[in-house]
């Protein structure tokens, strides 16, 4: 097998090669061992692994898995019930979404999802560690009703250190971004609905920071689509209705174990002519 390098698509032998990753960087330790920093291809997880634990994914296997991923997105969209509108003439304004994504490929796929759902969404590929620095300005520019803060995350080592923010790869950046968004919100009285988090994110701290929905209560992996499902449901729910996870729990990969929250007021506005 050739030497693994940045940009390669790999899986981890120690995890039975269950998840496909892209190698983002390779670190050389003082004892000459090499550690790869990995980002999930179809789940929002960031991880690391010794080079010797990695297996290169063949082109055929990669194409097969990517096809399965695309089909999963299409199937998830197809399962969403069609909303029956009143026979009266009406103008429907769904909530406007601003989506910040730390992963470029996920950002591109998110645009596709929102378009297929007919939603008004702006998607920006912003690295997790820069999201807090730009969110206030972006909120000022786009004035959304719903904010999605996501990308990749993961617990670093001891799975028992649930309450140590330093044991999470990107939760601290998501937390800072939520706080910045709430500063904007309080100043402008927008009543912004916020989803924040990715795989294994520090759920409690994200909620304390001001998120309405967040991941991951059980510190499990979440699906690429889970943040988008939350945003979509808030966007298409009438502004007179309060929406909770129970209203769309079946659309989430692992239900309340992956995503939960306090709920929020819907953002759809219907004007009858």
PLM ranges: what are they?
Residues 139-153, 211:
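Proline-aspartate-enriched helix->loop->beta-strand connector
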Residues 218-273:
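C-terminal functional extensions of proteins
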Residues 111-122:
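Short helix-loop-beta junction
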Residues 29-39:
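Short, solvent-exposed secondary-structure boundary/capping segments
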Residues 41-88:
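Intrinsically disordered, low-complexity, charged/polar segments
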Residues 17-28:
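Short beta-strand-centered aromatic/proline hotspots
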Residues 2-5:
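Short, well-ordered loop/turn sites that connect or cap secondary structure elements
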Residues 176-222:
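Catalytic cores of nucleophile-dependent amide-cleaving enzymes
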């Amino acid at each position: 097998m050739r030497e693994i390098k940045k940009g390669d698509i790999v899986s981890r032998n120690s995890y039975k090669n269950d998840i496909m990753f892209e190698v983002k960087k390779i670190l050389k330790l003082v004892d000459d061992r090499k550690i790869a920093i990995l980002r999930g291809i179809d789940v929002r997880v960031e991880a690391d692994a010794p080079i010797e634990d990695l297996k290169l994914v063949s082109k055929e296997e990669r194409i097969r898995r990517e096809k399965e991923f695309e089909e999963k997105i299409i199937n998830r969209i197809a399962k969403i019930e069609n909303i029956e509108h009143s026979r009266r003439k009406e103008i429907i304004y769904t909530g406007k979404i601003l989506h910040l994504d730390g992963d470029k490929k996920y950002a591109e796929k998110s645009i596709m999802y929102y378009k297929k759902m007919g939603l008004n969404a702006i998607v920006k590929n912003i690295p997790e560690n820069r999201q807090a620095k730009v969110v206030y300005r972006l909120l000022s520019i786009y004035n959304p009703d719903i904010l999605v803060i996501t990308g990749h995350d993961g617990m670093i080592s001891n799975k028992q250190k649930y309450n140590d923010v330093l044991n999470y790869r990107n939760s601290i950046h998501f937390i800072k971004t939520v706080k910045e968004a709430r500063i904007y919100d309080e100043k402008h009285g927008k009543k912004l609905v916020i989803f924040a988090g990715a795989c294994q994110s520090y759920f409690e701290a994200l909620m304390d920071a001001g998120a309405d929905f967040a991941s991951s209560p059980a510190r499990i992996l979440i699906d690429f689509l889970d943040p988008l499902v939350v945003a979509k449901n808030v966007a298409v729910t009438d502004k007179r209705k309060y929406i909770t996870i129970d209203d769309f729990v079946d659309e989430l990969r692992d239900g309340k174990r992956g995503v939960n929250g306090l709920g929020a007021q819907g953002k759809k506005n219907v004007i009858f002519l």
